[in-house]
Amino acid sequence: MLEEEQRKSLDAARQPMTGDRAIAVGGNVSGSILITGDHNVLEGITSLPTDYKARICNFILEYIGTPPRPVPFGGCQADLQTLDGWLDDPAALPYLLLTAPAGRGKSALLVRWLERRRDLALPVVFVPISLRFNTASQTVFFAALAARLAHLFGERVPADMSQAPDLWRGMASGYLSRPAPDRRLLVVLDGLDEATDWQAGVDLFPFEPPPGLRVVVAARHQANESGPEGWLRRLGWERNGLARSLTLAPLTHAGVSDVLRSMGVPLDALSARVDIVAELYRLSEGDPLLVRLYVDDLWQKGAAATRLQPEDLRTLQPGLHGYFDRWWEDQRKQWGRDAPLREPTVQATLNLLTTALAPLGKDDLLHLSNLSTWDLEEALRPLARLVVGDGRTQGYAFSHPRLGSTSARD
């Protein structure tokens, strides 16, 4: 009965909402306009000799989720409406810069916004720049960007992937300077700060954009920056009449409640528990990354989550350290007598992922850890909600870079 209720709730959650509720999303690969159908954002990218489709698809699914694995999201209705209003206003400035500290929910907001728009008449280019999903190099990023733009302009890209990245970059810049075939084009680039062997600069977008072009870029605040000014300057967007900025704020108490409600049965019952919401807000301090981690953990508990009491949370410290203290405590309870044997291998795996400069393949982890294949698989099992990748087509990495700064220890 509970599984049937969960299924119905998730089906309902995938429908666009109006009013003061943020969209509730369980996600559905077969129903996502972003990655399936005749107008998905991967069309054109698959024409490259090296297919980067899986990398971008996995990035999108990380924030949309699937029916058995819904991804917490909510409390962002005002930001979604701001993006809608900017896009729908023909007199709005052509460029929009989205900035915030790490973990504030920029990627989730953009992916959910594009999914919610569902506007088949608006051609969309979406290319994330992500270390975790191996799209941060200039070879991958500019080839994918150029290929997607070429598809929308009805043209072909070169079949030779050996050409210099500058050629792909120049090709993309050329398309962005031309009027779109349908006089409308939305380009969304997430994660400019994660670029590895290149930098986003004043040559990335035209200073005189063609009619109908709208561009959204997202980036984390850099060192000694607390606002959008640094990125506006790097892109040359500080001049009047070219760009507006949007900075994401932490979630409010109401936003945390909305995230719980969006998950459907059984967590929606907790959204009305003022005491539980207050404790989750205290622990997360409104940080969307932490809210997602705690709500993910509650979802895994199923119906037992509804028996959660505020006393169960009051001994925990706010922030990621408090979360990991609870996470280790829960793991030791699950392992029981095997905890002394299981904990060292899990911690060794976490430490390797923390110190790695890029995602690690399975063979890399086996070599560096001196673990057997069985021991490594057992060590990765409890890390499923913290680590992305399969070790083969996509290396293992933390689902968010901030997790690595807290999980390592001696």
Residues covered by each model-derived region:
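Long, low-complexity intrinsically disordered regions enriched in small/polar
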Residues: 1-58
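Post-nucleotide-binding-loop coupling segment downstream of the phosphate-binding loop, primarily
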Residues: 99, 104-184, 192-194
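C-terminal boundary/linker of central alpha/beta nucleotide-binding cores
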Residues: 111, 321, 325-408
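Conserved Walker B catalytic segment
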Residues: 184-218, 363, 372-379
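Sensor-1/coupling segment of RecA-like P-loop NTPase cores
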Residues: 208-234
